[in-house]
Amino acid sequence: MPALIVSVILNPGSARRLRAAPAPHRRLGALAAALALVFATAAATARADDKPEVTKAKLGFIALTDFAPLAIAKEKGLFAKYGMPDVEVLKQASWGATRDNLELGSGNGGIDGAHILTPMPYAMSLGLVTKGNKPCPMYILARLNYNNQAISIAAKYMESGVSKDASPFKPWIEAAKKKGAKPLTFAMTFPTGTHNMWIRYWLAAGGIDPDVDVATIVIPPPQMVANMRVGNMDAFCVGEPWNQQLINQRIGYTGIQTQEIWKDHPEKSLGMRKDWVDAHPNAAKAILKAIMEAQMWCDNPKNAEDMAKILGSKNWINCNIEDILPRLKGETNYGDGVRKPKSGEFMKFWRDHASFPYKSHDKWFLAELRRWGYFPAGVDYDKVIGEVNRADLWKACAKEIGQEAMIPASDSRGVETFFDGVTFDPADPEGYLAKLKIKNLDGKKGAKK
């Protein structure tokens, strides 16, 4: 900043010594001009300071409806709007591939961040699912959505009454045991992922031990329907559009949607490598702001059909719009011929704080990982969450895009209640575990996947 301008601001009396401004009105004019220049210079400096360090990043996604904010940010030019025109959004074959490519990082042919199952950044940061159990530090920058995953059941069980209640599976389980036959098989998408937690919670609520009574297998989301068609599993848990596609192809039906297990539950997150974010803080914020704006677009019901067309294209999910649109519009057809279709069961991208990464939600996922023996005893929940969850970055970005009103009063949403009446108090995760009847804390029971 020119010294003369500083002098005028800090010592207005010095303006009297300026030959160009001997009269009072001319002195004021000089001061106003100087102030204008100062503010313009400061604004330009701020813009330069906020400029992304790079214009490129590689983000992964799985072919699921809830990756929509990444597709929309790319298709609608939002990454470019925030100074990141060269962001690539790259399809991953499975959650295992997502993990592998995050471990590599873009510098080694992998990716920098991803549409990811909310517990995965924790499992990776702790080295629970990485090669050689070497930690791969990750951050969660935002939640991508609430709701709209489902547990789908093979058509042959339609008359058994398996739906919200999993207990009607019990006679089938016992019959298989008596015959020495293959146990009933339940598929999910990744061991330390949300879908494994949902199907385990549902089975346990019905009195079925997922580590003893049934077999569990890992299947990538786009392969679920094909595998059920050939009889490789009796039920699966996955996100849309695959549950709707199963019904459209008359292979099975929806037993329960996950928002019926836990209303407005968190699902996917925007996860990024810690080292990438730390090295490119402005670029990380630019990506986050683009995603947040995309979430607002996705949450507008008027955009549902446009979004379904975009997501269904070959570039993205590559499926029929009829597999995506109904549940995107909040319309649920269970496909069992018994329960009436429902409306209003929306996947939420922005409303009701769907984008904010509540730390209390992360704590529930860690408690469930602990419940089933994936998460070791003695780990400090709050310390781990503090290292991974970047709610602070989300709040900063919300202010910068004019969404300060969407910042919740607390990082905790408080006590949560599940469909079986069980409550989770984030202040006491171990107390929550103590009251659960079916669990596998040491991971030694059965052949846990």
Residues covered by each model-derived region:
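Short glycine- and hydrophobic/aromatic-rich loop-to-beta-strand nucleating segment
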Residues: A150-S152, S269-M272, W276-V277
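Conserved C-terminal helix/tail region of periplasmic/extracytoplasmic solute-binding proteins
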Residues: K363-K449
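Bacterial N-terminal signal peptides that target proteins for export
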Residues: I5-A32
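Secondary-structure end/capping motifs
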Residues: A279-D392
